[in-house]
Regions:
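Non-catalytic beta/alpha edge segments that cap or flank active sites
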Residues: 1-158
């Protein structure tokens, strides 16, 4: 199976309120389109467990191949993206998580503060969920590592 559909979920109260522009989400959408994906959904949601769970559930049920969740990977009181993602992922790709960390550390010592995870919702296929910290640099690093391997991930998942 060749993955073709993607969704971008940005969890950020400051973007939702208009205090900050959605530059990381826009970059993610652009990178996904450049990689040949159809971005069917690009939403900004409030931070917090329930909102992230609801948005992920909708994309997984829709059969979206690649779901990028930006934000909520720190240790703040509303940062639950990794915990929610963990409930959906059955095959975690810790090697890719490490590659993303190493790539991020080339640019910023803060890369190690992200708790983002990457994994498949089903060992036989399903959706690939990618967590990224909310900076443009983090999104570029994360997708720069993962996107070249998406075809291999889905081929191996068969």
């Amino acid at each position: 199976m060749t993955p073709t559909t993607a969704a971008i979920i940005v969890t950020a109260d400051r973007i939702l309120s208009g205090e900050k522009p959605n530059t990381a989400g826009e970059l993610a959408a652009s990178l996904m389109v450049d990689a040949g994906f159809e971005v069917g959904s690009h939403v900004v949601i409030a931070e917090g467990y329930a909102r992230v769970a609801e948005a992920l559930r909708a994309e997984v049920r829709a059969g979206t191949h690649v779901i990028v969740v930006i934000g909520g990977t720190g240790v703040g009181t509303t940062n639950y993206t990794p915990e929610v993602t963990g409930e959906f992922v059955t095959a975690r790709l810790t090697g890719l998580e490490t590659q993303v960390l190493l790539k991020g550390l080339e640019s910023s010592h803060k890369a190690g503060l992200s708790r983002g995870i990457i994994g498949m919702t089903d060992r036989g296929g399903g959706s690939l969920i990618i967590n990224s910290a909310s900076s443009r640099g983090a999104v570029a690093d994360t997708l720069g590592v993962v996107l070249p391997l998406v075809g291999d991930i889905f081929r191996d998942a068969r």
